[in-house]
């Protein structure tokens, strides 16, 4: 792929509303909060040659490949909500208040999938997740645990394992070191989410 990097630039990000600006202000021009702008580095965009654009396919050719074969979670209600199971290439956000059981549900889904699964738990160690899984009577040779919170490290795990499902618990704790901002900031969540989406496709 032939690409030429443009020069990186400095912007200022509001920690309240997530808007960014080319110049620093004491007050955010968007949400009017004071002292919320902090400096972050914007990585220059890459120029892509015409030969590097994504290919296209005729609809009938795609249908011949039988897309949409979903992966069952082995949980009837979860499969029903998901339209029959997990759709390969999709990115799903599991939301809810703290303590409602998001991580527990994610572990149960992982245990029911008969293919390699990668569970990234940046909030807990591998041992803590394993103890919780044992308490829930969850045991699986297909489930791989990691407490990695660096985006590049997560992608290295994905390359090695080639999992059919990746759980990120949670995206607020993941950091892309190319960005000069803290984990959980709007710029980090937006950038990491976009890269996870591109990878899932």
What are these regions (language model features)?
Residues 89, 97-100, 108-198:
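Conserved inter-motif catalytic segment of the P-loop NTP-binding fold
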Residues 2-4, 8-10, 20-95, 116:
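Detector for small/aliphatic-rich hydrophobic stretches
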Residues 4, 55, 78, 106, ...:
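A sequence-composition feature that detects small, non-aromatic residues
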């Amino acid at each position: 792929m032939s690409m030429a990097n443009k020069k990186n630039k400095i912007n200022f990000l509001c920690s309240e509303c997530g808007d960014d600006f080319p110049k620093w202000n004491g007050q955010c021009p968007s949400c009017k909060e004071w002292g919320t702008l902090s400096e972050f580095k914007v990585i220059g965009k890459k120029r892509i040659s015409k030969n590097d654009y994504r290919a296209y396919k005729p609809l009938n050719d795609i249908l011949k490949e039988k897309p949409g074969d979903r992966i069952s979670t082995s949980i009837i209600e979860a499969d029903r909500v998901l339209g029959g199971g997990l759709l390969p290439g999709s990115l799903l956000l599991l939301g809810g208040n703290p303590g409602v059981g998001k991580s527990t549900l994610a572990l149960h889904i992982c245990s029911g999938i008969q293919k390699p699964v990668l569970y990234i738990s940046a909030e807990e160690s591998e041992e803590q997740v394993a103890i919780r899984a044992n308490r829930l009577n969850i045991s699986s040779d297909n489930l791989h645990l990691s407490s990695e919170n660096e985006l590049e490290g997560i992608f290295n795990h994905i390359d090695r394992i080639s999992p059919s499902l990746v759980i990120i618990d949670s995206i607020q704790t993941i950091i892309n070191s190319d960005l000069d901002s803290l984990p959980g900031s709007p710029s980090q969540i937006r950038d990491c989410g976009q890269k996870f989406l591109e990878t899932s496709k």
